[in-house]
């Protein structure tokens, strides 16, 4: 063992839960030198020696009922973490979150690193989507992945100094000198945006002709946000392309380190600003997992209803703009009018439209208003007829069919390799929907179907979105008909302040109330994560608590980060016009990609 390798503690007792069977398979293959970490989750977290991580990952990728998807990969600076009893010594920890559809289970592999030797072998030879995840870990933590084909910054500019998710890097702007940009600095920054093909391994031409390089974005209507993709063109054919992200990066994971558990909620629905309350869900449920909070049944159903309202709103926008990018102008205007009906309901319930920040740890901010049923019933009566009109106007339109059929097509194997979830995966015939596979918030009590298509092309992706609107209406109808009575928030000291009369009678209760309200509640030490089906795919908040009022580390796995990474594998060899259709049918919000 090298001096900088980390020794494993003694092996841990066998866990009998089905998801932990893979641990015994690992021990059978590699011996006992693994450490299984106790977390609040229902799947194993296994520490592996750095020297064996490649073969362990390869084994998990090829084992019977394999872990076909690298769902997430990131790191954590552990140098200031106080409550890590029994864990392997580690300055920086890299984790690999793997997903198996056949097992319907996950495993998290962790590797401990010494701060003087932040080197790991790349996993891009096992899962191609490790490329961007490893670049992000390099960008944010300075971890070097040996053998990576293009290890460079991804969210921050190339000239950036430091690695922001390290603990010595301040989270507050007041810790730095004011930002001033003069002409020289502007020229310097603009020069670093210049695309040099050789830096990306691209050739300027071949023996017969020169290629043209075209910047699409970062301010282009078809990019659907602050996103640049550089195209290597031979005429109209895309020979290769380089997606360039980070223009919308706000450092939301760093922000979480200086917000209390409650005050971070408004930041979550700004990750995907079209997702609204659906974006609150994985965060609050991860915190509830940490705190052991049981959410009342009424609050669970209210959450489901709000989630599905925002799913409808997102999908109406998606379908309208996708059809518009294919040349159909009419549907988008009607769909925007229908979205206002959904916003009216959301505003009546939450008080806001786009950024309600309405879910709370333990439930919701308040109960449903009087006569909420009337607005919901009006939507349920209105939308089915409109959907029939949209289907006829768009999905039977020969122009739309011609522009989307067999365009930007990929199969299920490719989707899994690139970490695609949501409608992009279901358009290839795989019905993975977290609401069905791993029901949460009472979804197991609802009768709904998971729409799938099998062609994996642009038409299939739009059609799956459209069919999901029908299923969301079906779920909302069940919420309307079966809304339980009872409290809308858990009566738990980490979720709500104590009753007012008790604070006036008992000094200890008053002190607890004062500390909880002024400083925020202290969550138990440990780790928890929760996966939900947000409007664009599967999203996870992975939280590390150091028994403090704020998160020690918040990892946000968003679906669209890896969806954009897939672009070159799908579009190379196609036409520029096909790329426009592909971008329109990915369903992307750049704040969700860049965080």
Curated annotation (Swiss-Prot):
Keyword set includes Cell membrane: yes
GO cellular component, one term: plasma membrane
InterPro entries, alphabetized: NADH_DH_suC (IPR010218), NADH_DH_suCD (IPR023062), NADH_Q_OxRdtase_suD (IPR001135), NADH_quin_OxRdtase_su_C/D-like (IPR037232), NADH_UbQ_OxRdtase_30kDa_su (IPR001268), NADH_UbQ_OxRdtase_49kDa_CS (IPR014029), NADH_UbQ_OxRdtase_CS (IPR020396), NDH1_su_D/H (IPR022885)
Catalysed reaction equations from the record: a quinone + NADH + 5 H(+)(in) = a quinol + NAD(+) + 4 H(+)(out)
Region (NADH dehydrogenase I subunit C): 1-186
A Pfam family reported for this protein in Swiss-Prot or TrEMBL: Complex1_30kDa
UniProt keyword annotations, A-Z: Cell inner membrane, Cell membrane, Membrane, Multifunctional enzyme, NAD, Quinone, Translocase, Transport, Ubiquinone
Subcellular location: Cell inner membrane
Any GO MF annotation of the entry: quinone binding
Predominant cellular place of this UniProt entry's protein: membrane
Enzyme class: translocase
Record-listed E.C. numbers: 7.1.1.-
Ranges where the record places region NADH dehydrogenase I subunit D: 210-595
SUPFAM superfamilies for this protein: HydB/Nqo4-like, Nqo5-like
Membrane topology of the entry: Peripheral membrane protein
PROSITE patterns, per database record: COMPLEX1_30K, COMPLEX1_49K
Subunit structure: NDH-1 is composed of 13 different subunits. Subunits NuoB, CD, E, F, and G constitute the peripheral sector of the complex.
Family indicated by similarity: In the N-terminal section; belongs to the complex I 30 kDa subunit family.
Protein's job: NDH-1 shuttles electrons from NADH, via FMN and iron-sulfur (Fe-S) centers, to quinones in the respiratory chain. The immediate electron acceptor for the enzyme in this species is believed to be ubiquinone. Couples the redox reaction to proton translocation (for every two electrons transferred, four hydrogen ions are translocated across the cytoplasmic membrane), and thus conserves the redox energy in a proton gradient.
Protein name: NADH-quinone oxidoreductase subunit C/D
Origin organism lineage: Bacteria, Pseudomonadati, Pseudomonadota, Gammaproteobacteria, Moraxellales
């Amino acid at each position: 063992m090298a001096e900088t390798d980390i020794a494993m503690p003694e092996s841990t007792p066998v866990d009998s839960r089905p998801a932990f069977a893979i641990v015994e398979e690992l021990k059978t293959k590699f011996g006992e030198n693994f450490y299984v970490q106790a977390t609040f989750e229902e799947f194993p977290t296994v520490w592996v020696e750095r020297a064996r991580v490649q073969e362990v990952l390869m084994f998990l990728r090829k084992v019977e009922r394999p872990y076909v998807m690298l769902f997430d990969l990131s790191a954590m600076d552990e140098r200031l973490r106080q409550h890590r009893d029994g864990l392997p010594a580690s300055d920086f920890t890299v984790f690999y979150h793997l997903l198996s559809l056949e097992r319907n289970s996950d495993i998290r592999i962790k590797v401990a690193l010494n701060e003087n030797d932040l080197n790991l072998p790349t996993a891009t030879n096992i899962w191609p989507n490790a490329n961007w995840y490893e670049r992000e870990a390099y960008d944010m933590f300075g971890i070097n992945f040996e053998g990576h084909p293009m290890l460079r910054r991804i969210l921050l500019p190339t000239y950036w100094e430091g690695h922001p998710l390290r603990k010595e890097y301040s989270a507050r702007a007041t810790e730095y000198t004011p930002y001033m940009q003069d002409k020289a600095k502007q020229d310097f920054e603009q020069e670093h945006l210049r695309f040099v093909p050789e830096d990306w391994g691209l050739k300027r031409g071949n023996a017969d002709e020169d290629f043209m390089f075209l910047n699409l974005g970062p301010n282009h209507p078809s990019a659907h946000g602050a996103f640049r993709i550089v195209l290597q063109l031979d005429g109209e054919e895309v020979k290769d392309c380089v997606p360039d992200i980070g223009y919308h990066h706000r450092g939301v994971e760093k922000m979480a380190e200086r917000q209390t558990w409650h005050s971070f909620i408004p930041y979550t629905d700004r990750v995907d600003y079209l997702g609204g309350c659906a974006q609150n869900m994985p965060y609050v449920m991860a915190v509830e997992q940490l705190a052991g909070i049981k959410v009342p049944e009424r609050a669970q159903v209210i959450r489901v209803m709000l989630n599905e309202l925002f799913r409808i709103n997102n999908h109406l926008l998606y379908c309208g703009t996708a059809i518009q990018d294919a040349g159909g102008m009419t549907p988008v205007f009607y769909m925007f009018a229908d979205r206002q009906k959904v916003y009216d309901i959301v505003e009546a319930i939450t008080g806001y439209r786009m950024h309600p920040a309405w879910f709370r740890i333990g439930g919701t901010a308040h109960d449903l208003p009087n006569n909420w049923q009337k607005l919901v019933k009006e939507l349920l009566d209105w939308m089915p007829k409109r959907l029939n009109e949209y289907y006829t106007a768009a999905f039977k339109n020969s122009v739309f069919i011609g522009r989307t059929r067999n365009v930007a097509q990929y199969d299920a194997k490719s989707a899994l390799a690139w970490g695609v979830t949501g409608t992009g995966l279901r358009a290839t015939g795989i019905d993975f929907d977290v609401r069905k596979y791993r029901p949460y918030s009472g979804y197991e009590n609802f009768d709904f179907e998971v729409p799938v298509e099998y062609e994996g092309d642009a038409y299939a992706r739009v059609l799956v979105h459209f069919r999901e609107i029908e299923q969301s209406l079906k779920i909302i109808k069940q919420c309307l008909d079966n809304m339980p009575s009872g409290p809308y928030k858990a009566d738990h000291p980490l979720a709500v302040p104590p009753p007012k009369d008790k604070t006036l009678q008992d000094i200890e209760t008053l002190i607890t109330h004062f500390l909880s309200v002024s400083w925020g509640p202290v969550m138990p030490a440990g780790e928890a994560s929760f996966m939900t089906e947000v409007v664009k795919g599967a999203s996870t908040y992975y939280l590390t608590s150091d028994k403090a009022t704020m998160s020690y580390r918040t990892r946000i796995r968003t679906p669209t980060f890896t969806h954009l990474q897939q672009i070159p594998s799908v579009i190379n060899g196609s036409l520029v016009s096909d790329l426009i259709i592909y971008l329109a049918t990915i369903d992307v919000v750049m704040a969700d990609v860049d965080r």
